[in-house]
Amino acid sequence: PAEHVGKVRITRTKKFAPAGAAVWNTPGIDLKKGKVFFGTGQSTQSPASEFSDAIISLDLKTGERVWSTQTLAGDAHNVACEVPMARQWGCPYENGPDYDFGASVIKSKTSKEEEILLAGQKSGWVFGLEPNSGQIIWKNRIGRGGTLGGIHTGMATDDKKLYVSN
């Protein structure tokens, strides 16, 4: 939960943190197993959330977290802080690379007919995760990452190949 961590310099109002991490992709649902899964973005303020740059699975009925797999710890980035005047307003001290999971996580099958989650990140990496535990099975870099690079949206699969824009 958010805790009081100081005051905003200009307005002198109370500042609470952490802010968590944004979700800007469409969550996937596994109705048979009763699970929801999605990727998160970076934290926008310090301290960076343990759930930033992560793939998360929730129980569909209760909303309780089943597992969370963070691929990059300490990624707090706020694009407003790239403007010199804005830096005085409490920019994150981590100043991470901004490696969100913007593309929706896809549930698919391996060549051995085993279930797998496929997740693409702005880092340029694609991850294959075990859907029950969130354990990373493999990862493959398909391109250069960055704030405006890597995988933002638009992955698709035919259960034989994964199609990714970069």
Regions found by a protein language model. Give the residues of each.
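Soluble metallo-hydrolase cores and metallopeptidase-like ectodomains found primarily
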Residues: 21-23
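Residue-level signal for short, function-critical loop segments
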Residues: 42
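Beta-strand-rich domains and repeat architectures in extracellular enzymes and scaffolds
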Residues: 25-37
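Extracytoplasmic/lumenal domain signature
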Residues: 1-18, 32-35, 45-101, 106-165
